Amino acid sequence: MGETVLLAAGGTGGHVFPGLATAAALHDARPDLEIAFVGTADRLEARLVPEAGWPLHTVPAMALRKDLSALKLPVVLGRAVSATRQLIRQSDVIAAVCFGGYTSVPLALAARTTGTPLVVHEQNAVPGRANKLASRAAAAVAVTFEQAADGFGSTRTVLTGNPVRPGLLPDAAPGEDLVAVRARLRDEALSTFGLRPDRRTLLVFGGSQGARQINRALTGAVGRWTRPEELQVLHATGSRTHDETVAAWEAVEHGGLHVVVEEFISRMDL
């Protein structure tokens, strides 16, 4: 295995997708680099990272909840750090990057104890708990919003913005203008999601895990819409609230409204 950059981006799309965008950019800049991810076997990264073509090494991890047992945390965290440290030593890891999520802390601690350079990327205006902990071992923290720098104390911060994966930017075929690109993507979206071409579409989403208040507000407002027969809804419920939202849609009178419910939409480029 050649020189490797190890990334931790897990739990939610807000962490995973910037990680995937960074992996693609690193590969474009240095095709000789090996890119690998650290993650958990039962979270979003377990599907998205392999789908993007990158290897995922799974380690034990758990949410950094405030009510977490003081007895459980050291045990599980210790196992995750040990597994990540072993991965670093088995590979020629020249740098590590944390994007937040459960596995960022184990990677940060493993990087610190092996002398591996570490960078943290924070996507939010208010830093998450995992990244704040990981930043203590980082050479620098890249932030999307300038105000996020206040949450990282004395650690050096750099305003970089949020990495955007190439798939969100439409690729035009030779000789294809923007109008043709939009028409092609529209046809693909109609086919992919089972939407109707003669209706206006409302897209509703609240992140990969879901936003219960958004979901409830949407299903609760359906009966008050005018001319619902002219509309359709593409609703991404999120993983945590999918079943209850499907049940809510089944319980309301649609009034001719065409509804497509998905747990997660990976083709946001459409």
Predicted features along the sequence, with ranges:
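Glycine-rich phosphate-binding loop signature in dinucleotide/nucleotide-binding domains
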Residues: 30, 87-94, 195-197
